[in-house]
Amino acid sequence: MSTTITNSTAERKHSHVDICLRGDVAFSTITTGLERYRLRHNALPELNYDNLSTETDFLGKRIGAPLMISSMTGGYSEAAELNGKLAEAAERFQLPLGVGSMRQALEESSHRDSFAVVRRHAPTTQIFANIGAPEIAKGLSSDDLQTMIEMIRADGLIIHLNAAQELFQPEGGTDFRRVLDEVAAITAKLSVPVIAKEVGCGISAPVARQLLNAGVRVIDVAGAGGISWQKVEEARYTRRFGTDDRFSTRGLEELLNWGTPTAECLVAVNALRENPTPPFSLIASGGIQSGIDIAKSIALGADLAASAGALLRSLHSGTLEETLTTWMNDLRAAMFLTGSATIAELQNNRPISKQ
């Protein structure tokens, strides 16, 4: 919801990270829904735990585990250090990495190194460029697209759909007309695959089908249950204006917790594979907090999971690699106890039941 204020994109990016680290911005009335599912125990796994590998394939490349370090930040001076450390971890574990929105890099070349740094620290793993729906709606030139791809030698482009965030953002862009047409134009122009993701409100099956028909190759449902970006932007708004009189008290509470749980989105979008539809990969994100969450997501049909908030907090506390190691151990334990020798078996056997 736009208003007459001035604030640079760089300042906004910095405040996003600060609020996510220090503020209470989690959904308060919605969970991911993953807790409603239970991985089914196999008393005869017939496996050697020590030989289990979490490796899998994503967009034609072998990766270390079905986990993406999801889009977080970039476009301000301190972001270079954060992105460099994220890239180092991605390289060590051979995990895909998504950068934050590259709008700032298109606006000001001085901020490009905060994104380019990732490829220097992660020369072999998959890295994905990122741009938002409001920028898409305005139309991106072929030069803009090429600049983003070349800047980080990207393996693909993430387009994030963030209508609720933009609604709450003080300087948000809420004209979402022609986004789908522009997505189709971009997929036709680019030689790399396009990922469409939400940012915490979820993607429904009908919207996923529209995106797939527009040429998108990967759907990241990014459902509710983790960070509420409405709350992040609300915190920015109240820091600046003191109170928020844009909505009624009751309406505000509902809107701050607006969204569809991650598990609900995942099950619905995965069901599209049962009907004629373009082939696609499926990512589960939104409140992923452990390797067990990853395992449940895979068992519900995801090809991989993705996490941003939990990994950002562990990076801030200096425990990112330790966190990733424990998550991989969680995942291998779940594979062992469900009798799944590979990630494909965990996905195809559906060893999961609803509580």
Curated annotation (Swiss-Prot):
Alphabetized InterPro entries for the sequence: Aldolase_TIM, FMN-dep_DH, IPdP_isomerase
GO MF, one example: isopentenyl-diphosphate delta-isomerase activity
SMART domains: IMPDH (SM01240)
Binding residues for substrate: 12-13, 101-103, 165
Residue positions binding FMN: 70-73, 101, 130, 197, 308-309
A GO BP entry: isoprenoid biosynthetic process
Protein family (similarity comment): Belongs to the IPP isomerase type 2 family.
Protein name (database record): Isopentenyl-diphosphate delta-isomerase
Species lineage: Bacteria, Pseudomonadati, Chlorobiota, Chlorobiia, Chlorobiales
